[in-house]
């Protein structure tokens, strides 16, 4: 279940990579990114309940998502806040590893997977400015 979730995140990140950034996404996709950050925070709390506080698996995935999406300062702050809110919400609710926390972990993974899949299926149109006529990018030597 978690492999599918992470594959979805990787797919979303791969499609979002390159010159596009989170600001280039429509509002509904930015909202999905925020929901994904929350799901990652939930998953982080639930995994730590069973694996210990040293486990940083989902936190590292969140950091990678921010790195790939390259959000502006406002959206980056919102992503981090949503991750932390998801973490806090389930950390208090599931402080120990038991059957209930494992079920919640699977549910968070399914939700995150669905969000990542929706994000990975979207395309982003990016406007690029034309390079200067005498630019090296066009194969001509700069004057």
Question: Which positions does each model-derived feature cover?
Answer:
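Immediate post-signal-peptide N-terminus of mature secreted/exported proteins
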Residues: 22-53
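N-terminal signal peptide c-region/cleavage motif recognized by signal peptidases
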Residues: 17-19
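Compact alpha-helical subdomains of small soluble proteins
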Residues: 25, 54-143
